[in-house]
């Protein structure tokens, strides 16, 4: 079995060490006998997103989100095609925000999103970040899974009505 991962904007959207997340994905798959191809893509590079099994987009500060947005917008139809063909997406932090309607920072500035989903994110109080281990249970395709991870965010995502 093979797994093709496309890590988008690896050079810009790596705020909290998403390189480690990509490497963990690779190693866990390889331990299960899955051959992994991990490719990167940044602004201006051509990749056929639909050829990948997993689209990975990490976190980035407001500056980096603004930098990549025009490039992401040019890829919107390709991303939609990949979604329609059941490509999996792992979106972290700013990557997640960019797939919603918008992100509003603490000064009221808005970074537009790709609008794939109904949600939007608003920056929270700088002194009230959500930081720590997290475990959630979810059901997908009739199977129940426990997802375990670490959260570190200050934004509040609202209007989550579109099923992922």
Name what the model sees in each region.
Residues 30-34, 84, 119-122, 157:
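Generic secondary-structure signature for well-ordered alpha-helical cores
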Residues 9-10, 41-43, 58-60, 92-95, ...:
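Fold-independent oxyanion-binding glycine-rich loops
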Residues 62-137, 144:
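Cysteine-nucleophile active-site neighborhood
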Residues 25-34, 102-107, 159-164:
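Short charge-dense sequence patches
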Residues 12-15, 62-64, 121-124, 156-160:
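Short, acidic Gly/Pro/Ser/Thr-rich loop/turn segments
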Residues 1-81:
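N-terminal beta1-alpha1 cap of cysteine-dependent amidohydrolase-like domains
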Residues 2, 124-164:
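Amide-donor transfer/coupling interface in amidating biosynthetic enzymes
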Residues 6-18, 46-49, 103-111, 144-153:
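Short low-complexity stretches enriched in small and charged residues
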């Amino acid at each position: 079995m093979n797994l093709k991962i496309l890590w988008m904007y690896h050079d810009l959207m790596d705020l909290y060490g998403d390189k480690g997340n990509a490497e963990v994905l690779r190693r866990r798959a390889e331990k299960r006998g899955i051959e992994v191809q991990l490719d990167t893509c940044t602004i201006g590079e051509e990749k056929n997103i639909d050829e990948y099994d997993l689209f990975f987009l990490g976190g980035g500060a407001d500056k980096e989100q603004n930098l990549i947005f025009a490039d992401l917008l040019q890829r919107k139809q390709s991303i939609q095609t990949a979604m329609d063909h059941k490509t999996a997406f792992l979106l972290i932090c700013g990557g997640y925000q960019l797939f919603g309607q918008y992100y509003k920072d603490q000064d009221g500035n808005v970074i537009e999103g790709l609008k794939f989903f109904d949600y939007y994110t608003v920056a929270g109080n700088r002194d009230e970040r959500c930081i720590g281990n997290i475990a959630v249970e979810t059901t997908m395709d009739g199977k129940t899974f426990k997802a375990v991870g670490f959260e570190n965010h200050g934004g509040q995502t609202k209007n989550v009505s579109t099923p992922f």
